Amino acid sequence: SELTIRNEKGKDFACIEDMDFQIGRVLEALKETGEYENTYIFFTSDHGIAIGKHGLMGKQNLYEHSWKIPFVVSGPEIKKNTEAKGNIYLLDVLPTLCEIAGITIPETVDGISFNKVLRGKKNKVRNVLYGAYSGGFKPGMRSIKKGNWKLIKYDVMDGAFTMPRKVQVNQLFNLNKNPNELLIEHQNEGVIAITKNIPKKNQINLAENPKYKSRLQKMEKLLFSEMEKVGDPFKFWNQKWVI
């Protein structure tokens, strides 16, 4: 309900305010000890919750509003007020810290150092970003992102506590033109009245559009490749088993 969403947003804003205060205390302590200019500061977070977006409340989804998280770094030789557009995983933080500290990166580490990205010597370290959600009644939710294109693939049970049904759906988005991953439902007059947002006609799921069949196939192939690469045991209805 609208009241629930307002309540959750209030909690969100309160958390942000307190977090800002606590970070300020840390920064002041560094300045008081004279270590501020000689310290690398990494700020990031856990995944957020939807709070009404896409009609969802939790974070059991792979949309950008829940999947994408803040990542801010400051420190010596890092240019202020700059932004890197590339992708990273949190597992890339360890090798990055090792490289900054002059420590040999362990061979067992799967991450990639983005130290050169921080220093403006490289634009990105990853072209592809893979995401998975495997909780509860929705074990088959996977996503792949490359450039402006993103595919979310579902093989899940919907309404598991009432009348469960199998849902096998693809969602294809051009994030450059549809950054909020809007669906056809967002063009409903009732939804527009609540959100006060009028989507453009092409801001929908493109997976069912024959014009984007080739793009869908390419993204699916890339997704399946990444699943095999990381050893993901789940298999979609149209995914071939590799023995």
Residues covered by each model-derived region:
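Long, internal low-complexity/basic segments
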Residues: 1-7, 15, 19, 137-140, ...
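A long, amphipathic alpha-helix that forms part
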Residues: 1-39, 100, 214-215
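Flexible glycine/proline-enriched surface loops and loop-helix/loop-strand junctions
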Residues: 4-8, 54, 75-81, 99-100, ...
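Beta-strand elements within well-structured catalytic alpha/beta cores of enzymes
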Residues: 12, 16-19, 23, 40-45, ...
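Surface-exposed helix-capping loop/turn segments at secondary-structure junctions
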Residues: 25-38, 99-108, 212, 222-237
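Histidine-centered active-site microenvironments of extracellular/periplasmic hydrolases
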Residues: 28-79, 89
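C-terminal cap/loop subdomain of S1 sulfatases and analogous C-terminal strand-loop tails that border
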Residues: 47-53, 79, 91-94, 99-195, ...
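Conserved beta-strand positions that form and line the central face of beta-propeller blades
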Residues: 50, 62, 71, 83, ...
